[in-house]
Amino acid sequence: MRASITWYDLLSALPDATSEDIQQAYDAKAGLLRPELLSGAPSRVITVAARAQGILDAAWRVLCDPVSRQRYDEAAGLWDSGGGLVRPGDYPAESGLPDSDYAADNPGAEVLRGLGALNVWLDRHSDYQRRIPVPDVRGLFYDVFLGVVGRLDLQVTFVQLTEHPMPVDGLVVDQSPEAPTKIHRRGELTVQVWHPPGRATGDSPAAPYTRPPLT
């Protein structure tokens, strides 16, 4: 079955990652959304950054707690009955969480729902000549986005929004065509990507970030 996008993918973490690895993956991405890095950014970037933070928080909520993580891993079929990691090609098409685990306004759940539905559609329509619905990729970091489109065989055109970008992972803030427009397999998807601006004296990566408690 076609590999699905998981909560782990949204954090750029592996299913066998330790709790410390999960925390570090979250902190690395959330650190790029700090207010001082967003200062002066266009309003649409601020809006999408809030969506991105919601996606990260949703993934963190599921994976930071051992009980919820185990329940998710089992529901998503990431581990076999013997406790071994399932091969990527055997991942289920669905997202792995029942609807009751999703808040209606949860952006992370919204992303997984959309990508999970697309995976199901692709499993049923494998003909490369068919048109596929474009997923909503706004709020994904660029490395996560590449993982998504790599599974869809879409051709990507990258538009850099920051004149002197900091050498860190960028944030997808807009796309063309918009979701859920249908395009041909191997069709072109254009994304606009924002990076924090580099310092005038030289680009510098973001400072370490520690996640505050969620309320």
Tell me what each language-model feature is.
Residues Q129, V172, R186-E188:
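Extracytoplasmic
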Residues D27, G31-P35, R61-S68, G150, ...:
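Sec-exported extracytoplasmic/periplasmic mature domains
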Residues Y8-D9, A59-V62, Q70-H125:
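Post-J-domain flank of DnaJ/Hsp40 co-chaperones
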Residues M1-I46, I55, W121, R131:
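N-terminal J-domain/J-like co-chaperone modules of DnaJ/Hsp40 proteins
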Residues E178-D203:
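Amphipathic N-proximal alpha-helical interface segments
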Residues V156-I183:
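BRCT (BRCA1 C-terminal) domain core and associated BRCT-interaction motifs
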Residues W121-T162, A200-T215:
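Glycine-rich loop/hinge motif
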